[in-house]
Amino acid sequence: MNNNIIHYTLDTLGLRCPEPVMLVRKQIRHMQNGEMLLVIADDPATTRDIPGFCQFMEHTLVRAEMERPPFRYWVKKGK
């Protein structure tokens, strides 16, 4: 993560599916390609939904901490 600057942080603690992914999508729409978003979540569904979202939308999941909540995801905007 040395060269990856976090440009935005999105706290979705307490929110449940589908809200975290909807908020990630909304935030990424307003970002430039290559910018990094740190997502903090405690919904177990995000361990499946956020990696799936990144793959489907062609963003890069740079790093994920999914061992126990709060989960953290570093998402770099693609395209």
From Swiss-Prot:
GO terms for molecular function: sulfur carrier activity. Transmembrane segments: none annotated. Keywords: Cytoplasm. GO terms for cellular component: cytoplasm. Pfam families: TusA (PF01206). The keyword Transcription regulation does not apply. Coiled coil: none annotated. The keyword Cytoplasm applies. InterPro entries: Sulphur_carrier_TusA, TusA-like, TusA-like_sf. SUPFAM superfamilies: SirA-like. The active site is at 17 (cysteine persulfide intermediate). One of its GO terms (biological process) is tRNA wobble position uridine thiolation. It is found in: Cytoplasm. Sulfur carrier protein which probably makes part of a sulfur-relay system. NCBIfam families: PRK00299.1 (NF001423). Belongs to the sulfur carrier protein TusA family. This is Sulfur carrier protein TusA. It comes from Actinobacillus succinogenes (strain ATCC 55618 / DSM 22257 / CCUG 43843 / 130Z).
